[in-house]
């Protein structure tokens, strides 16, 4: 059942709105890239996803559900968290270097923060931390939402690494994500990292515990 936002959440919501306005040039830049790269349909889908998040606080379900237990998208808000809970989301992985859900008071108890600078790939050890967190949460019956600012680069890189770790090739992993989010825009560095990750296939449990 949805509850009224706490004062901390209300402040976080206002701060997030201010940040959203500040992010508008980046949103428009991504929109233009999407239009040039994949045409008007993908650009329109990108806009629908973005403005749905602005209005409801959560992305459209059909643009975020990669597998039944793994969803990916952009920044949610306190208003949007109940919508994610209705979809069964129990845990969150945040890759935004510029915004910590926990500090904003909108993180669930099962929360992993992997701060990554925008347009850069996460480190391999952070990929492993994220993969183990997702695996453990799903194994315990949970459902995970992975996000960055717009849900087109940093977050989908982690999801691609998770899918590769589950046995998919990099191309299969990207195709699986694109079925849900046709407008993703991983950078060349992020794509290269997944290729490298697939070739090396590190022992994540050993790497994280070292």
What is the meaning of each model-derived region?
Residues 32-33, 99, 157:
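Sequence-pattern detector for short linear motifs
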């Amino acid at each position: 059942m949805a509850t009224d936002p706490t004062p901390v959440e209300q402040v976080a919501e206002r701060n997030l709105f201010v940040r959203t306005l500040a992010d508008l040039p980046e949103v428009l830049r991504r929109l233009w890239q999407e239009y040039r790269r994949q045409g008007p349909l993908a650009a329109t889908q990108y806009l629908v996803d973005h403005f749905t998040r602005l209005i409801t606080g959560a992305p459209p379900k059909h643009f975020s559900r990669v597998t039944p237990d793994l969803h990916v998208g952009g920044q949610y808000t306190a208003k949007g968290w109940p919508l994610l809970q209705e979809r069964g989301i129990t845990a969150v992985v945040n890759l935004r270097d510029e915004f910590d859900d926990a500090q904003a008071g909108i993180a669930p108890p099962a929360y992993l923060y992997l701060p990554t600078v925008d347009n850069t790939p996460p480190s391999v050890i952070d990929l492993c931390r994220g993969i183990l967190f997702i695996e453990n949460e799903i194994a315990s019956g949970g459902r995970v939402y992975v996000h960055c600012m717009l849900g087109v680069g940093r977050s989908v890189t982690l999801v691609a690494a998770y899918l590769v770790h589950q046995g998919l090739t990099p191309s299969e992993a990207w195709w699986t994500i694109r079925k849900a989010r046709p407008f993703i825009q991983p950078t060349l560095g992020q794509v290269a990292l997944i290729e490298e990750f697939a070739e090396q296939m590190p022992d994540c449990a050993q790497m994280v515990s070292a």
